[in-house]
Amino acid sequence: MKFLLPSIVIFLVLCQVFGEELGPKEDLDYWTGSNQVQDEWLQADPFREIIRRMTRKPRPHQFIGLMGKRSPANAQITRKRHKINSFVGLMGKRSQEEPESYEWGTVQIYDKRR
């Protein structure tokens, strides 16, 4: 058993060493003299390219807002009236002037503590 393990290791090492090609690999030339992609990148001015990309506006079909696409059936844009003293949030509609609102109650509590 002690003789078998070193002989297998030596056999695998010899297979690795003699399994390699000894000649130069001329067909696998990864570093060619002319790199077409790099030449195209160097021709354009990088600063102008960055500014052009920053100032480019999205096309109308590319821009989709937070609420998703609008349906083409309702093409009319209707303006909703905004009430000055009301707030519609995730908890529902609340008015700032109502004394039973949460904000009004906290203001009253702070005034009483002073």
UniProtKB/Swiss-Prot annotation:
Annotated InterPro entries: Tachy_Neuro_lke_CS, Tachykinin_dom, Tachykinin_fam
Keyword match Nucleus: no
GO cellular component, one term: extracellular region
Location within or outside the cell: Secreted
Source organism, top-level taxon: Eukaryota
Triggers of expression: Expression is induced in the hypothalamus and olfactory bulb after feeding.
GO biological process entries: chemical synaptic transmission; neuropeptide signaling pathway; tachykinin receptor signaling pathway
Residue(s) carrying Methionine amide: M67, M91
Pfam families tied to this protein: Tachykinin
Signal peptide per UniProt: 1-19
Keywords, in A-Z order: Amidation, Cleavage on pair of basic residues, Neuropeptide, Neurotransmitter, Secreted, Signal
Propiece residues: 20-55
PROSITE patterns linked to this entry: TACHYKININ (PS00267)
Tissues expressing the protein: Expressed in all parts of the brain, with robust expression in the olfactory bulbs and tracts, moderate expression in the hypothalamus and posterior brain, and weak expression in the telencephalon-preoptic region and optic tectum-thalamus. Also expressed in nerve fibers, intestine, testes and pituitary gland. Not expressed in the liver or kidneys.
Function field: Tachykinins are active peptides which excite neurons, evoke behavioral responses, are potent vasodilators and secretagogues, and contract (directly or indirectly) many smooth muscles.
Family per similarity comment: Belongs to the tachykinin family.
Domain remark in the UniProt entry: Neuropeptide gamma contains alpha-helical structures at the C-terminus which may be required for interaction with a cognate receptor.
Descriptive protein name: Protachykinin
